Amino acid sequence: MIVWQALFVVYCLFTTSIHGLFQDFNPFANKNISLKFPSLNRWEKNVMATGQQTIINSDSIYEWTPILSNITAGKKDSFVFTIDAEASGYGFAPTYEVLMFISGNICQMPMNRSDVDLTIYYSFNETVLENPNIGQSAVFQDGYIQALAISPVQSSSSNATSTYSNLYVVAELVNSTTEQPLSSSDASENWEYRLSISENDLVFQWDVRPWVEVLDTDMNSALLSTGNVTADAKVYHNYSIYDPSLYDLYVYSYEDSVQLNQNYNLSLCAVKNGPYLVSSQNTSNATVTSNSTNPLERTDLAIQKKITEYGGSVTEMFYVTGLNASTTYVAYLTKKISNGDGLSSVGGILFSHVYFTTRSTDVCSLIFGLDFCSDVAYSVPTSSFSVGNKTLMAQTYDHIAEALYANFSKALQLISCDADKDARYSPVMTCDDCAEAYRDWVCAVSIPRCTTTSSQYYIHRDKSHNRNDYLNKFIKPLDDYYEILPCIDMCYTLVRNCPSDFQFSCPNDLTTEDLLYQSYNFYMDTDYSTCNYIGNSSLMVIHPLDDT
């Protein structure tokens, strides 16, 4: 998106019109464009006397209020968009061209109709309303459409006006092979769609990235996290404000998602109005605050969300509860966009979906939100002392790690952390860096990550023979499990960040191979976790796959 915006600025400086170029090229294909400027332009429904026109709304419809229409075979929807050159792009566009962003979604359509396309025709020539073929066209694909219409600007000493006054748009169902309009004899099937035109942004957008990661699951819950949302914050001097309503998550059953992906894979409207099981948009008390009941105790079908620091960045987490065991679900992430005056309730961005599967037993329990080990957000061996009480279980694990950290904290106080740089143990690292590295490491080795899946990268743990005696005594796992070993990178970070006085060292695959692979593993670029990492994930090194 940044590359496109930069190219657009350069382009505007060296050309006076790209209207002709756009006849055969749509530069917005597979792009997520975001040019957020306010405008007061409006749609006007074109009411014609011919019998084939459909009046959707006889009133004016303003920008950022997409058309919602139902269309059948043999009908045409037609619109007129009034162009306002002075209001476009905060004064940049009037010097060159006025851009009109066309975008839309199919919300609902008949099943198995790959032989029919919903096509949009647009032109500055009014005769397109009678003869759509004279205009440019764009077809809804996977439930989504985006196109760009460009009007040159005529400048004078007093003002700048668009060469054209109106953009005319026609929507029609056509045969996908012949591209001919369908006859009214097929009018029994209904298509519902939304369409928007803006001089400042694509109201409907999609992003090829998932932008949400499945952190882990247990038998009846799942934890997902967005990417870094720091750029979405409102910054005020020395603090930032994050809006938890910016992102929402919709969870579908696998079966319903198959149908959704066949026809509406890129349709925000279809996802938000489809047969989803649960959504953070519709869950009561979805936003978790400091005064909220502990989210780990919620068991009904719901999604709770919270802005949090995780893995060295700020993300929004979604905790999904009330799920069935051994079941595959599909999650769709959406994002609101700005209309210039704040977040808009219409339109937005749809990201690529992700899959997750719950576990078959309660051998592992998903915990997060710990006080000391705040970056722990994964499944751990279920404690036989607190079955059904994740809050108590999380506190027990947290207290074990904090107790192990206490002696190290006292030893670190003996280091001259506040001395001049030339007298410190490192001119680059500080005692705070060392303390953080040790905390992450001790949390990872004392709070094992649990899975029920066998892998060459995982270690099988007997319920009575765990990584350390603290787990045997204070946790007593419910059953045998597989441990996802800590990433060796955390040990490397510990050695690098702490004073040599501690004589920390890490096992290696040359002299202590057995010790290495019994205690740690490497991070591999696979579709599942080969090791467990806590802390700033940007410090991780991706190692080549081990084919052995």
UniProtKB/Swiss-Prot annotation:
The chain crosses the membrane at residues 342-358. It is found in: Cell membrane. It holds the Pfam family Mid1. One of its GO terms (cellular component) is endoplasmic reticulum. One of its GO terms (biological process) is calcium ion import across plasma membrane. Changing C531A: Functionally impaired. Residues 21-341 are extracellular. It comes from the Eukaryota. The keyword Glycoprotein applies. N-glycosylated. InterPro entries: MID1/Yam8. Disruption phenotype: Growth defect during calcium starvation and in the presence of lithium. Residues 359-548 are cytoplasmic. Glycans are attached at N32, N70, N112, N125, N159, N175, N228, N238, N265, N282, N285, N291, N324. Calcium-permeable, cation-selective stretch-activated channel (SAC) that functions together with CCH1 to mediate calcium entry into cells. Required during mating. Together with CCH1, essential for tolerance to iron stress, which leads to an increased oxidative poise, and to cold stress. Forms an oligomer with a molecular mass of 200 kDa by disulfide bonds. Interacts with CCH1 to form a Ca(2+) influx channel. This is Stretch-activated cation channel MID1. It comes from Saccharomyces cerevisiae (strain ATCC 204508 / S288c). The lineage of its organism: Eukaryota, Fungi, Dikarya, Ascomycota, Saccharomycotina.
